[in-house]
Amino acid sequence: MPYSLEEQTYFMQEALKEAEKSLQKAEIPIGCVIVKDGEIIGRGHNAREESNQAIMHAEMMAINEANAHEGNWRLLDTTLFVTIEPCVMCSGAIGLARIPHVIYGASNQKFGGADSLYQILTDERLNHRVQVERGLLAADCANIMQTFFRQGRERKKIAKHLIKEQSDPFD
């Protein structure tokens, strides 16, 4: 189902809310929602650190929730909104779930599986191809990632300072 720009913006803002949940837990802030007939049927945010599971990406969580909602592994007639371009693993899962449409915010130059590094979602050698749109609220989506990495650098500085204070009592 095609959505208007206003509707797409709303759903990406919902994905950004999911990304914010990850940011609050010091996780890489990626958020995702899956929409069918104008209703969000799956939500997810990155939770690898919290769960100690490498596959707990936003897209994987949203796919699992949408599968449960639909009672089916096939997520036909859905659109996946994600703040950052899906990685290779998530791109594979999107194809396997038969999600026909993906809209993402910012590119993923290091791990992108939709456009930047690999084109898994549109590869003609695969039996399921996905319509991909990019750049929706890209600045907002990139901004939350920059905030995460800036906070990480600040946490490292504080930790380094605390370690120095503890190890050198004569400072």
UniProtKB/Swiss-Prot annotation:
Cofactor: Zn(2+)
Superkingdom field: Bacteria
GO biological process: tRNA wobble adenosine to inosine editing
InterPro entries noted in UniProt: APOBEC/CMP_deaminase_Zn-bd (IPR016192), CMP_dCMP_dom (IPR002125), Cytidine_deaminase-like (IPR016193), tRNA_aden_deaminase (IPR028883)
Location of the active site: 59
A Pfam family annotated for this UniProt entry: MafB19-deam
MF terms in GO: tRNA-specific adenosine-34 deaminase activity; zinc ion binding
EC assignment: 3.5.4.33
This protein's record includes keyword Signal: no
Catalytic reaction list: adenosine(34) in tRNA + H2O + H(+) = inosine(34) in tRNA + NH4(+)
Residues that coordinate or bind Zn(2+): 57, 87, 90
Keyword vocabulary terms for this entry: Hydrolase, Metal-binding, tRNA processing, Zinc
Domain CMP/dCMP-type deaminase: 6-133
Family indicated by similarity: Belongs to the cytidine and deoxycytidylate deaminase family.
UniProt function note: Catalyzes the deamination of adenosine to inosine at the wobble position 34 of tRNA(Arg2).
Subunit structure, interactors included: Homodimer.
Name of this protein: tRNA-specific adenosine deaminase
Record gene name: tadA
